[in-house]
Amino acid sequence: MVVLSKLISSILFASLVSAAVIERQATSINQAFTSHGKKYFGTASDQRLLQNSQNEAIVRKDFGQLTPENSMKWDATEPSRGSFNFAGADFLVNYAKQNGMKVRGHTLVWHSQLPSWVSAITDKNTLTSVLKNHITTVMTRYKGQIYHWDVVNEIFNEDGSLRDSVFSRVLGEDFVRIAFETARSVDPSAKLYINDYNLDSASYGKTQGMVSHVKKWLAAGIPIDGIGSQTHLALTALASSGVSEVAITELDIAGASSQDYVNVVNACLGVPKCVGITVWGVSDKDSWRSSSSPLLFDSNYQPKAAYNAIIAAL
């Protein structure tokens, strides 16, 4: 009788575990996350990845937002002056619309992946005209289709000073005003972001530089809606700058520790202004740093322990 009782208990336990696994498999991370009042749980992608059936199936099931990994960057959209190419970006935006996903426009102004013809500009009026035209053309094409734009990206040094770039050299920090005011005039409904990495501590120079500059720019009337951070450790400090929202924008974690991923999710849940999280890719196979296995799905597109831990935490 005792043996039978133990057998029944074991069967019941196994059934409960199986049911839990099935429930996890049927649950979308995006649905679980947004059930807590957040806007989305997203990922980075592009046409090549969305045409991979294994990758696409995961994107469609688990994510509610897409960030183009490369197809909206300047070298992709305007490789030569006045000559625009939107093929890759169009594919991603259309896919997102068809599947009810939000899109993060990434990125309008960045010192990297910048065509040499832009980097070579030395005249203030020329660069101002080029900057306005680029932002206007790209944003007009997707007006009303982009939830938020990374208007300026990675513009700070580690000490919080402005990074040297063609934009800061020729225009000083006024390029920030030009970019945001142009973006607001083109698509008033889009959320406009400043995005950066290594915002790891409220006391870190880069974080302090971000917060102080954003406070100053907001006071001057520059229309910055949000700060995007590629980590989660200083969300409260970033939110204190006066922006209406913050987001975790390019998340990957070397080794994909379950606890670290859960900590990120809990950090966003704990900051009212944090609207969402975007992981930088689906599978380790396609990650820009694949050797460190930083994502939620392994190289065979199978969910890792961190994926299950997030679902369990939500």
Swiss-Prot record:
EC number in record: 3.2.1.8
Protein name stated in the entry: Probable endo-1,4-beta-xylanase C
GO BP annotations, alphabetical order: xylan catabolic process
One MF term in the entry's GO annotations: endo-1,4-beta-xylanase activity
Family listed: Belongs to the glycosyl hydrolase 10 (cellulase F) family.
SUPFAM superfamilies attached to this UniProt entry: (Trans)glycosidases
Key words of the record: Carbohydrate metabolism, Disulfide bond, Glycosidase, Hydrolase, Polysaccharide degradation, Secreted, Signal, Xylan degradation
GO CC annotations, alphabetized: extracellular region
Subcellular locations according to the entry: Secreted
Claim: Disulfide bond is one of the keywords in the record: yes
Domain GH10 positions: 23-313
Catalytic-site annotation from UniProt: 154, 250
Gene: xlnC
